[in-house]
From Swiss-Prot:
The gene is psbE. Heterodimer of an alpha subunit and a beta subunit. PSII is composed of 1 copy each of membrane proteins PsbA, PsbB, PsbC, PsbD, PsbE, PsbF, PsbH, PsbI, PsbJ, PsbK, PsbL, PsbM, PsbT, PsbX, PsbY, PsbZ, Psb30/Ycf12, at least 3 peripheral proteins of the oxygen-evolving complex and a large number of cofactors. It forms dimeric complexes. It is found in: Plastid, Chloroplast thylakoid membrane. Heme binds at residue 23. This is Cytochrome b559 subunit alpha. With its partner (PsbF) binds heme. PSII binds additional chlorophylls, carotenoids and specific lipids. NCBIfam families: cyt_b559_alpha. It comes from Marchantia polymorpha. Belongs to the PsbE/PsbF family. It is a single-pass membrane protein. GO terms for molecular function: electron transfer activity; heme binding; iron ion binding. Keywords: Chloroplast, Electron transport, Heme, Iron, Membrane, Metal-binding, Photosynthesis, Photosystem II, Plastid, Thylakoid, Transmembrane, Transmembrane helix, Transport.
Length: 83
């Protein structure tokens, strides 16, 4: 026999008008906020990832792969010199 937690059943929540009034505003707002966050370039600045036109510079057109197991620090230093 299971106990009652006192919470409303999920079916009652999603069929209520109040739920849809609140979520018809918040869900599109979150979508628009996420779209603006990415389209303005703020996501690149916040997370520090390079913008699409910054992956390859004029000096370095190849993919920066670490190929050596024991000299990886030197390879990373070479890659970061171009930044």
């Amino acid at each position: 026999m299971s106990g009652n937690t006192g919470e409303r059943p999920f079916a009652d929540i999603i069929t209520s008008i109040r739920y849809w009034v609140i979520h018809s505003i918040t869900i599109p707002s979150l979508f628009i906020a996420g779209w603006l966050f990415v389209s303005t370039g703020l996501a690149y600045d916040v997370f520090g990832s390079p913008r699409p036109n910054e992956y390859f510079t004029e000096n370095r057109q190849e993919v920066p792969l670490i190929t050596g197991r024991f000299n990886s620090l030197e390879q990373i230093d070479e890659f970061t010199k171009s930044f």
